[in-house]
């Protein structure tokens, strides 16, 4: 086998959302990087919905931007509708979401990656890892040659032994139109990796000109919503479009009920478990039998195509049943299908063999990110890609790994969850997964995390200075307003107390007391308002975190023998040995580990220390 004459610091396998972020970040840190993908024309392809962000997910994209990653930038360049979800709810759960032009998203990502110094993008299909039994050495390809590298980042998406289901038909594929990767799964098994099987799905695509939008509810976008942190108002570069909302009918319900036995999911042909919070339409009909109808969202796939995505109508039914189901939906009576819906099963690696840095515990220098770790979603994948890319370079440079904590980021919540929990379904980020979500708002991601991005060499000094200035402005104005007393109603109170009232906004305060309130602009002003309005809750959460940190960050030696600690329960010994947590905090979050087990472990660690 011929070996390519260049040795790389980092080899990234797969150019989906995880792989693109990993390759970009590694190269920006000064590493020589190979990004290996089976098809250059599908770089950063949005395989499912034409959207980025949402509740929890939008928070992650803002964190990626704060750390110096690229998903936010590409989303803003490609966005054809921007919205803030949960506007009427509390600030912790408000989140940006964008409809993007799928073709432009790919084009912008490919163009950006091609301009990064030190990054070599190459078409080729990874077939097997090269290793010496302890350390990864590179990768061999289906085409018959090899690449050598000091580290390898594996971001295979749904391609590992991918199996596509449409009714009773199934065939190999990484997604519809692309071949599956068969060799990598076998190679990981050879190396001792425990593999599981998960499932996801995507709905049919329809021709917009065949849809009756007049019977649907129009859903326009919002103004001044974006993913890249800015001081100024955001004006999209592309024309903005609307989505539309329709619903299923009694006929839809009857069709699905009568044909359940023909569904790949209910016919017993699918082995993998699907995402609970993104169910197929047949799942909804079965599990919510009391509901007469379900909402369907019609989302445009781009400005230069008539194709639309039918959000809420994912299915693994046969194509003839899909045809009837679609035409039973209000406004879709004459719809023309351009691509069928399908379900896909794929292999993933269990989290107990992965460190929070995303390095494998079994083979040194091998990092895993994205759906191979059991997650679902572009945003979760991109965040893991950033972490894996950064830590692959840290490995080469012999620097300690970068692992943000769950107290300071949603990315940290995800890393901790993936490496301490047994997944029984694809992992999706929600704000409810974070214990301190009021501290992890989407508006303050830059103030929370930009110092990491700057120290890693990913975030420019100019952008870091912007975040520092925003933070300083908010702290100074909070202090000033707390000392500025004015009459409001019948009493004289500090202006911070006025802003704490639920009916008073920062803009109203600015209008009513123009001589006393500094105009920080709409972006920083909104953050100031949240910091003041929720200061009591924020202070309590910060106090709780400080009290927990004393035990949370106690390190556990890598060579600890849990089976020798007889006071631990049998379940605790087995699970701690399986997951090998690095800290007491991580150990405490493993399912089945009791408070008593943690107390025993801490006593044992103190004895060993003495």
From Swiss-Prot:
InterPro entries from the entry?
FAD/NAD-bd_sf, GIDA_C_N, MnmG, MnmG-rel, MnmG-rel_CS, MnmG_C, MnmG_C_subdom, MnmG_C_subdom_sf
Essential cofactor(s): FAD
Q: Its domain of life?
A: Bacteria
NAD recorded as keyword: yes
Q: Where is it mainly found? A: cytoplasm
Its localization reads: Cytoplasm
A Gene Ontology MF term for this entry?
flavin adenine dinucleotide binding
Which residues form each disulfide bond in the chain? none
Summarize where FAD binds, as residue positions: 14-19
Keyword Oxidoreductase on entry: no
UniProt-annotated binding residues for NAD(+): 274-288
Instruction: Return the Gene3D superfamilies for the record.
Output: FAD/NAD(P)-binding domain (3.50.50.60), GidA associated domain, C-terminal subdomain (1.10.150.570), tRNA uridine 5-carboxymethylaminomethyl modification enzyme MnmG/GidA (1.10.10.1800)
The record's note on quaternary structure and interaction partners says: Homodimer. Heterotetramer of two MnmE and two MnmG subunits.
Record function comment: NAD-binding protein involved in the addition of a carboxymethylaminomethyl (cmnm) group at the wobble position (U34) of certain tRNAs, forming tRNA-cmnm(5)s(2)U34.
Record protein name field? tRNA uridine 5-carboxymethylaminomethyl modification enzyme MnmG
